[in-house]
Amino acid sequence: MILDKIFEKTKEDLKERKLKLPYDMLGRSLASNPFFPKDVIKALKRVEKEVKIIAEVKKASPSKGVIREDFDPLSIALNYEKNKAAAISVLTEPHFFKGSLEYLSLIRRYTQIPLLRKDFIFDEYQILEALVYGADFVLLIAKMLSMKELKKLLEFARHLGLEALVEIHDKEDLSKAIFAGADIIGINHRNLEDFTMDMSLCEKLIPQIPNSKIIIAESGLENKEFLEHLQNLGVDAFLIGEYFMREKDEGKALKALL
């Protein structure tokens, strides 16, 4: 299963990074250059019919390979911000998605909107890294964490002033997210175990999500009418990556969905 492969490779990488830069040294680097995260809840909470999009900076994926050959992460991010993205998602996983923490740091330096560190996070060190490199919120995938692990990581993120987007794909994942106290719940139409898509997932899961939660729809989103349909179901914002990455002008494609 691809999720297991990514998880194992991420564990290997993390072990190496911890040896190069131990936790206390990573924390000291933050103390010498403090960063104050932005208000992610305010940025993503829908106001009336406003369309809010988390636009993604993504070079590749395990299911599609390289998506964007002419990949300039900063140029893409600036184009997103110019065209009114609510936030930017930055892939930092290097092997399967060709991402980098350096992309996150670079984009933070030149943009003002909230940034999501999108990676396979299972350790507090990765959350501290996210803060050091300039993220305002992190992705936590319910499928790859136990209830207790998810709760612990979510609480640690908040302790640092970060928010978390807790990604779910089924009722079991949703139970974990609610138990952990997630405020932002992402419904991923794509099953990460086999990459199959279920575009009716929001219809199935949203009725079980408390009204106080911010709901994000993820994957397979490229049609304004479908976005409006999901808004009517209660979706606050949309995470869109591959669709924009395949377009010649990602900013123009973003603007067309707003």
UniProtKB/Swiss-Prot annotation:
Catalysed reaction, written as an equation: 1-(2-carboxyphenylamino)-1-deoxy-D-ribulose 5-phosphate + H(+) = (1S,2R)-1-C-(indol-3-yl)glycerol 3-phosphate + CO2 + H2O
Key words, A-Z: Amino-acid biosynthesis, Aromatic amino acid biosynthesis, Decarboxylase, Lyase, Tryptophan biosynthesis
InterPro entries reported in the protein's UniProt record: Aldolase_TIM, Indole-3-glycerol_P_synth, Indole-3-glycerol_P_synth_dom, Indole-3-GlycerolPSynthase_CS, RibuloseP-bd_barrel
EC number, as in UniProt: 4.1.1.48
GO BP, sorted A to Z: L-tryptophan biosynthetic process
Recorded superkingdom: Bacteria
Keyword ATP-binding (UniProt): no
Pfam families referenced in this protein's UniProt entry, alphabetically: IGPS
SUPFAM superfamilies: Ribulose-phoshate binding barrel
Manganese recorded as keyword: no
GO molecular function terms attached to this record: indole-3-glycerol-phosphate synthase activity; phosphoribosylanthranilate isomerase activity
Pathway: Amino-acid biosynthesis; L-tryptophan biosynthesis; L-tryptophan from chorismate: step 4/5
Membership in a protein family: Belongs to the TrpC family.
Record protein name field: Indole-3-glycerol phosphate synthase
Source organism (scientific name): Campylobacter jejuni subsp. jejuni serotype O:2 (strain ATCC 700819 / NCTC 11168)
Underlying gene: trpC
